[in-house]
Amino acid sequence: MFRLKELQKKQQQQQQQQQQAAAPATNGTDAVTTEPTDVKRQNSNDLKEIRKQKSKDSYFSLKTKQSSESGSKRANPAELRAQKDIDEMEVPTGCAVSFKDTNDILNFNLSITPTDGLYQSATFQFTINIPSTYPYDPPKVHCDTLVYHPNIDLEGHVCLNILRQDWMPVLNIGTVIFGLMTLFLEPNPDDPLNKDAAQLMIDNKKTFEANVRQSLRGGYISNRQFPKLL
């Protein structure tokens, strides 16, 4: 009887020892199991935070870039005034304005086809450059078409009073275009660049007019051939 109780007691002790031994193992297992989960959760949170920060940095980087680009493309006073002139301009009949580069408003082409006078129906091409000091300084005008004219020399320089001493800041691009058209309608021999043509216009207007017609048909004047425009 005593021996049986002793054996039962030993078995209980062994079971308790096994339970105690198993308890740390279980706790260790939990620690091993839960530790990776906690680390994974922490890593996930860190990753989200990093992504959020990167997204924030990218946004401000983009805004800074846009601001920088906007600043670099800011129009200068000459461009603002030229844009205003063009917006308000009424192009005379027979004139057409074109831009090689739509982003460059300070350089453009002008074609003039007079509707009356000696140069009627011929088309003349001009290049116009607006200086950075505009409107305090006048536009620079070059005639790209070789023409027999008292106020335009054979190199394409144009003699127009408002492009020189008579220029004022209140004048505009439209005024210049109108002035160029007027040169073809009413050539001015009193302020010439082609002095031979101007003198002939004064001395013998009929011969001058004949020379103009001949030049527009691609003929020669003083051993110089002109392009055929009619």
UniProtKB/Swiss-Prot annotation:
Parts forming coiled coils: none
Residue ranges with Low complexity bias? 10-20
The keyword Nucleotide-binding belongs to this UniProt entry's keyword annotation: yes
- Look up the record and name the pathway of this protein: Protein modification; protein neddylation
SUPFAM superfamilies according to UniProt:
UBC-like (SSF54495)
Comp. bias regions, Polar residues: 26-36, 61-70
Give me the stretches of Basic and acidic residues compositional bias: 37-57
Query: What class does this enzyme belong to in the EC scheme?
Result: transferase
Q: What Gene3D superfamilies would the database entry show?
A: Ubiquitin Conjugating Enzyme
Q: Which reaction is catalysed here? A: [E1 NEDD8-activating enzyme]-S-[NEDD8 protein]-yl-L-cysteine + [E2 NEDD8-conjugating enzyme]-L-cysteine = [E1 NEDD8-activating enzyme]-L-cysteine + [E2 NEDD8-conjugating enzyme]-S-[NEDD8-protein]-yl-L-cysteine
Q: Which GO BP terms, alphabetically?
A: protein modification process; protein neddylation
The job of this chain, per UniProt, is described as: Accepts the ubiquitin-like protein nedd8 from the uba3-nae1 E1 complex and catalyzes its covalent attachment to other proteins.
What is the protein named?
NEDD8-conjugating enzyme Ubc12
Gene that this polypeptide is encoded by: ube2m
